[in-house]
Amino acid sequence: MIHDMIKTIEHFAETQADFPVYDILGEVHTYGQLKVDSDSLAAHIDSLGLVEKSPVLVFGGQEYEMLATFVALTKSGHAYIPVDQHSALDRIQAIMTVAQPSLIISIGEFPLEVDNVPILDVSQVSAIFEEKTPYEVTHSVKGDDNYYIIFTSGTTGLPKGVQISHDNLLSFTNWMISDDEFSVPERPQMLAQPPYSFDLSVMYWAPTLAMGGTLFALPKTVVNDFKKLFATINELPIQVWTSTPSFADMALLSNDFNSETLPQLTHFYFDGEELTVKTAQKLRQRFPKARIVNAYGPTEATVALSAVAITDEMLETCKRLPIGYTKDDSPTYVIDEEGHKLPNGEQGEIIIAGPAVSKGYLNNPEKTAEAFFQFEGLPAYHTGDLGSMTDEGLLLYGGRMDFQIKFNGYRIELEDVSQNLNKSQYVKSAVAVPRYNKDHKVQNLLAYIVLKEGVRDDFERDLDLTKAIKEDLKDIMMDYMMPSKFIYREDLPLTPNGKIDIKGLMSEVNK
C-alpha cells in the first residue's frame, strides 16, 4: 500500500535511480532522471508565483516530458489537465474556457493564440531540465487536493472536467496493486498507449510508478500506422497490456500478435468500453496462458470500480462478460428509479459511493449537482449504466441508460443488438444505431457493419449479404430487435479515446 504518490516515486529514485521508468521507442529515461527533471521544473513553477493549487494545462502526446511535467506539477501543489495534441481546436478552446488554467505547459505545439495565460513550450522545459535545480518537496498535492482533471469527451455542450484528488487516486492505485483479479506483476513492464487525456492511462501509469516498473510508450504516429504499429509492438518487452478492447481488436489483425512473438506478455487489462466474448475468445486463442482482466468504471469514480479475471467457463457460458467484483472501499449498489436498493439479480442503475468518487466537475456546479449526491452518508455518483449484481458479488453490465430505446412498444438495449450482430459468422464488428422522426420517436434501427475478410466476395449484392446475416441471426435475435437497414463500412469510427464512436454515428444518422 502506498500513502503518497510523490514519496513513492522519490523512494524509487533513491533505491533504483538507474532503473528505466519510461521507454519511448528505445529512448530510455530512468527514475533518477525523472527526479532531477521534475525537481528542476517544480522549482521553476514555484518561481512563477501562480495562484496556489490552481490547475495547469499540459498539452502533448506520449512524450517523456509529459510524465516529468505531471510529476513536477504534483510536487509544486498544482493539479494538471492533460490535453492530447490531436484534440480538435474547438475542444481545446472549450477546455480553456471551463478550466481557466493559470499556466500552459506545451510539450506539443499549442495551436491557440492565448493572451492572458503564460505558456512554457517544450524547448523551455528542456532548458529547465538542464538547469538541474534541486527541490525540496514541501507543498505537494495531498489529501483532497486535485491531482489531475480529466475532461470527458462530451459530444454535446461544453466538456466536463472531472476532478480527481490525491485521495481518489490512492483509493484506485492501492486497490489495483493489491487486488488478486489484476495480480499486477512486480516491477511491471507496461504498455503506455491510451493518451494521457483519457483516464484509462491512469491504469498503466499509477500502478507502474507505485511499484517501480517501466512504461513503454506508443506515440500516436505509430498507432496510426498499422505496419509500424505491429513491428513496434513485437519488439516491446511488455508484460502488461492496458487498452480499450477496440485497440486489442486492431492488434489482433496481425497474425504475429500471439504468445510466440510476445512470450512475456502475460496480462491484459481492459476498461473504457465493453469487452465482448468474441474479443476475449480471440485473445485466449492467441495467448492461452495470459490473464485477461475486464474492468469497469466511470472517470468520475477514478478509472475503475470493479474487475474480474475472465475464466474459460465465462467464455463458454456467458453471452455478456461480467464486469467485475467491486472494490472493498467503494460500496456499489444497483438502484431503481426511486433510488431504492434492488436485490441481487434485478436490473437498475449502478451507483458508486466512497473514497474513489470525484468531488465533481470543475467550475460546473449545475452538472455536478445532477450526477453527484450523498448515499447513506457517503459521496456517491450516478453512473447512468444499467446493471445487476449476482449472489457471488459479480457486477453484470446491462448497457447505457441513454442507449436504451423504445421501439414499436419494446424496450431495446442498443448494446444488446450490437452484441447479437457481432455473433454472425460474416461480421467482424457491428453497432446498432436508432433513427428518430421529427417527434423524436424511433423510426427504425440501422446496423453499421464491418465484414470479415473475404466475405464480400461471396455475395453479388449487399441485399443478398444482408439476407444471409439476418438468416444467420434469426435464432438468437428477436424480430423486433433486427435492424431494418444494414450499412457496410470498411471500419467503424473511433473517438479520440479509441472507443467506437456510437454517438457520432447517431449524429450522422439523425442530421
UniProtKB/Swiss-Prot annotation:
Q: Which PANTHER family match?
A: ENZYME, PUTATIVE (JCVI)-RELATED, PTHR45398
Per the record, the pathway is: Cell wall biogenesis; lipoteichoic acid biosynthesis
Q: Which UniProt keywords apply?
A: ATP-binding, Cytoplasm, Ligase, Nucleotide-binding
Q: Cite the CDD domains for this sequence.
A: DltA
Q: What PROSITE patterns does this protein map onto?
A: AMP_BINDING
Known role: Catalyzes the first step in the D-alanylation of lipoteichoic acid (LTA), the activation of D-alanine and its transfer onto the D-alanyl carrier protein (Dcp) DltC. In an ATP-dependent two-step reaction, forms a high energy D-alanyl-AMP intermediate, followed by transfer of the D-alanyl residue as a thiol ester to the phosphopantheinyl prosthetic group of the Dcp. D-alanylation of LTA plays an important role in modulating the properties of the cell wall in Gram-positive bacteria, influencing the net charge of the cell wall.
Source organism per entry reads: Streptococcus agalactiae serotype V (strain ATCC BAA-611 / 2603 V/R)
Q: Does the keyword ATP-binding apply?
A: yes
Q: Which GO terms describe its cellular component?
A: cytoplasm
Which EC number applies? 6.2.1.54
Q: Which compartments is it annotated to reside in?
A: Cytoplasm
Q: Name one GO biological process term.
A: lipoteichoic acid biosynthetic process
Coiled-coil ranges from the UniProt annotation = none
Native organism taxonomy? Bacteria, Bacillati, Bacillota, Bacilli, Lactobacillales
- Which family does the similarity line name? Belongs to the ATP-dependent AMP-binding enzyme family. DltA subfamily.
Q: Name one GO molecular function term.
A: ATP binding
Q: Which residues of the sequence carry a binding annotation for ATP?
A: 152-153, 294-299, 385, 397-400, 499
Against Pfam families, the record matches this protein to: AMP-binding (PF00501), AMP-binding_C (PF13193)
Could you list the residue ranges that cross the membrane?
Answer: none
- The coding gene here is dltA
- Provide the catalytic activity annotation: holo-[D-alanyl-carrier protein] + D-alanine + ATP = D-alanyl-[D-alanyl-carrier protein] + AMP + diphosphate
**Protein name as catalogued:** D-alanine--D-alanyl carrier protein ligase
Instruction: Kindly list the positions annotated as binding D-alanine.
Output: 199, 303, 499
List the signal peptide residues.
none
